[in-house]
Swiss-Prot record:
Organism: Bacillus cereus (strain ZK / E33L)
Main localization of the protein described in the UniProt heading: membrane
Matches recorded under InterPro entries: AAA+_ATPase (IPR003593), ABC_transporter-like_ATP-bd (IPR003439), ABC_transporter-like_CS (IPR017871), ACT-like_dom_sf (IPR045865), MetN_ABC (IPR041701), MetN_ABC_transporter-like (IPR050086), NIL_domain (IPR018449), P-loop_NTPase (IPR027417)
Protein name, as recorded: Methionine import ATP-binding protein MetN 1
Subcellular location(s) per record: Cell membrane
Pfam families in the record: ABC_tran, NIL
GO cellular component: plasma membrane
Entry membrane topology: Peripheral membrane protein
Record keyword Metal-binding present: no
Function according to Swiss-Prot or TrEMBL: Part of the ABC transporter complex MetNIQ involved in methionine import. Responsible for energy coupling to the transport system.
Family statement: Belongs to the ABC transporter superfamily. Methionine importer (TC 3.A.1.24) family.
Amino acid sequence: MIELKNVSKVFTTKKGNVEALKSTSLQVKKGEVFGIIGYSGAGKSTLIRCVNLLEKPTTGNIIVNEQDLTTLSTKELAKARQKIGMIFQGFNLLKTVTVYENIALPLRLAGVPKLEIEKRVEKYLRIVDLFNRKDAYPSELSGGQKQRVAIARALSHEPEVLLSDEATSALDPETTDSILDLLLKINEEIGITILLITHEMNVIQRICDRVAVMEHGAVIESGTVKEIFTNPQHVTTKKFVNSAFAAKIPAEVQKELQRTGEIVTLSFIGNSSGEPALAIATKRFQVYPNILSGNITQLKHEAYGKLVIHMQGEKNEVDRALSFLQEQGIIVEGGRTDYGKQVLFG
């Protein structure tokens, strides 16, 4: 559906050349929600603006719907862009016209017939649950409502791809969740492919199927959201995953606890998150776990949780208990045993 092949972007400044993208390649499958996450300056905004050639790449190929956009004429590119919708952090609504006209005007300029415009405006305002505000002006809307209008406007061209450039970063947490729910609904009901960029792990875990992590203009890790959450490899990826779990254990406390036992992180995914495996292990083996922190969050279609525990007992019994937990589908990290990577506490 979307494929970037060795895409680079170099900006020329007074101080010299700045390489915003470094030979980046990735694929987005038809119908999926693909997220790109990274800190400020990682290159994610440049990347997403290259997808519809708002930024022309210095090198590489951008293939959307089996068309290499970098080879198209101006007229051909304009036509191809009609199948690529885009929403932004800043909404970009016309302040002097109504909600209805904000959606209808671009369709009019594109030569869509009047009756079809009326049909589409109503259809997509109903999808974003704002048809009753069609005669309102942007100044009369909340931030979340403005973003819903922007989404309806993008959808009114009936694109096959929707690009989201930090579309929720200016919104409060509750409104962010409502916009994410709307994007997920659109993806599932309309089947539109969504490529989004964000610096918030909450966005990734709520609606994405797959994710790429960017740093210094390059993709440093990618995979399914489940893979990234349960087995992050790069230190930056680990920081993003840990940001989804608020609890932090002070270094002094860790040091003191490690004198009398092992500090272990247990990660649960899907069905295993509901199993009383820890309780069973406590009864079956001579171990005494003390829960230091815990959190359960929801990925797109399944639960994911973490428990940080202080496990006391004879080493042999602790080893057996941790092996048992692994057999139950629980990911075991940390401690003095060789059960996985060193756990990070934030």
